Amino acid sequence: MTNGAASNGASPSVRPSREKERQLLDFEDQLSPVERKQITFVRNTFEPGGWDRAVRLAQRYIGSNWIEQCTKNIRHVHGTERLPKFDRNKSYLVVANHRSFFDLYVVTGYLVNRDMPHRLLFPVRSQFFYDKPLGLFVNGVMSFFAMYPPVFRERSRAALNLASLDETVRLLKRGGMFVGLHPEGQRNKGDDPYELLPAQGGVGRVIQGAGVEVLPVFINGLGNDLPKQVAGNFTRKGTPIIVNFGAPVDFGDLLTQPPSPRLHKKISEHALDEIRRLGAEEREIRASLR
């Protein structure tokens, strides 16, 4: 059976061949002992079995509920009618703008609370989360190990990032995953939330390699001060958080072309254009709340 993504152009039935996928742990000489152990541990939680089942239940019934309680009074969600009906056996990729550390938590927390059964996955910087033992604890407590795989900032370890992208593709292809990525590649610290950073090619590489439906979303209103954010929700005086979902992205013939860094950036730019369009809608929605 052809999946829904193929019918809208998001996932063509014939995909170009790709180079051999890299494995993060193949680069043992570039990883510290702590990084190796923590990557191995978190990776194993994604393997079918008791760990994976336990983490899915924790994300579904604990993580999503505390996010719901901490945001529901000031959160406004639009565009849900554009979303597909989620199939538990398929994987999905959400692409969002990046203003706050908590963007994807709020987006996916909302969906999980409305019966999306998928395992969550958000690539995260390696610094602290994978090179410090405390990072593993925070990853487990804050996200139930959704923060995986690690992304490495050092240019000398660029090959590790390609391996992390390939690991993301591998998990998406397995099915039952919901992955969140930011085409901008880093948090946008500018004053204007509607002025997005340039697209980076890594997201395009994942989109082309995985062949899953890509769901765009624009989110605005979240800060990075967690206590202040939570207090604003309970007093109902915090900045409104607006989440605006779009329909699955149609990439036309981009995904059937031979893979290359230039093509991957085009794919990322196309996804970012959809996010930008949703941002224009969000601006109008926000104005109507005043």
Can you annotate each of these PLM segments?
Residues 2-38, 42-43, 47, 160-290:
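Non-catalytic C-terminal accessory region of glycerolipid acyltransferases
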Residues 26-78, 133-147:
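A transmembrane-helix-recognition feature enriched in membrane-embedded lipid enzymes
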Residues 45-46, 86-157:
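Catalytic core of membrane glycerolipid acyltransferases/transacylases, capturing the structured
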Residues 63-67, 112, 139, 169, ...:
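Short amphipathic alpha-helical segments and helix-helix/interface helices
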Residues 66-98:
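Helix-to-loop junction immediately C-terminal to a conserved catalytic motif
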Residues 73, 116-118, 239-241:
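Residue-level signal for beta-strand positions within conserved beta-sheet cores that form or flank
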Residues 73, 89, 144-147, 174-175, ...:
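Structured helix-beta-strand junction loops
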Residues 79, 106, 163-167:
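Well-ordered alpha-helical segments embedded in enzymatic catalytic cores
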